[in-house]
């Protein structure tokens, strides 16, 4: 579609008196309101009425949680760099989505190039095979190899066909070392992405009177995408990695 019907509906709902939506969308919007600085927005809902309330808990767990996994980090690489194998139907990278929007800013373009380049250090094509064979290709894959090795070392039945779960604390020395390296990488990656988000936010505020509605919507969508798909998860992952290097955790 020329415009995503879900995105169009969300945009229209901001000015509606009554909105009917599913639990997942309500929770995601509530979770992202704080991230995007919209918690005090007058257009935020003031009343919620839930039907089939037993779904709320799963929706809340999904919306307000984060997971540091090889899959999630590989998805971020794909979102930032786009299709790298020439076979997958998706996806456009950040260069194609943002390039023409920030073409007038050398600083923003430099940040975009830096972020795209650093994303190479996240898990890439074939990561599952490399991690299972303990042959990591970069810092991120090294961390997940360390996690996998620790799981098999601590599992009571490492040959089980079902999911393996073990206590993470205290983390092995190898996990802590690889966690610090990955944290440094994620911090380096978050810097240019934050610059991009700040630049887009500035464009919205400074050019509000001159932007046509389509361009403004594209910039707003790009800003929300950066916060939801990049800077938000990166901040959560860094907290997890920092926490992993402690001896134990309360709660």
What are these regions (language model features)?
Residues 1, 11-17, 30-47, 52-251:
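Conserved coupling segment at the C-terminus of the helicase ATP-binding
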Residues 4:
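Short cysteine clusters
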Residues 8:
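Short acidic active-site motifs
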């Amino acid at each position: 579609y020329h415009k995503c019907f879900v995105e169009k509906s969300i945009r229209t709902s901001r000015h509606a008196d009554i909105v009917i939506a599913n639990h997942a969308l309500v929770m995601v919007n509530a979770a992202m309101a704080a991230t995007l600085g919209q918690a005090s927005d007058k257009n935020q809902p003031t009343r919620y009425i839930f039907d089939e309330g037993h779904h709320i808990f799963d929706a809340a767990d999904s919306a307000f949680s984060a997971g540091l996994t090889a899959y999630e980090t590989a998805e971020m690489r794909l979102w930032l760099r786009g299709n790298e194998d020439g076979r997958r139907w998706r996806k456009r990278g950040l260069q194609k989505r943002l390039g023409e929007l920030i073409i007038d800013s050398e600083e923003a373009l430099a940040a975009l190039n830096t972020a795209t380049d650093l994303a190479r250090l996240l898990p890439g094509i074939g990561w599952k095979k490399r991690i299972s064979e303990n042959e990591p290709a970069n810092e991120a894959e090294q961390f997940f190899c360390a996690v996998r090795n620790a799981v098999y070392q601590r599992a009571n039945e490492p040959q089980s066909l079902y999911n393996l779960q073990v206590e993470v604390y205290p983390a092995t020395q190898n996990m802590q070392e690889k966690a610090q390296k990955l944290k440094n990488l994620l911090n380096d990656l978050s810097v240019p992405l934050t610059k991009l988000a700040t630049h887009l936010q500035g464009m919205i505020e400074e050019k509000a009177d001159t932007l046509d509605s389509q361009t403004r919507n594209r910039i707003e969508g790009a800003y929300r995408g950066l916060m939801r798909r990049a800077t938000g998860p990166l901040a959560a992952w860094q907290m997890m990695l920092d926490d992993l290097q402690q001896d134990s955790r309360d709660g």
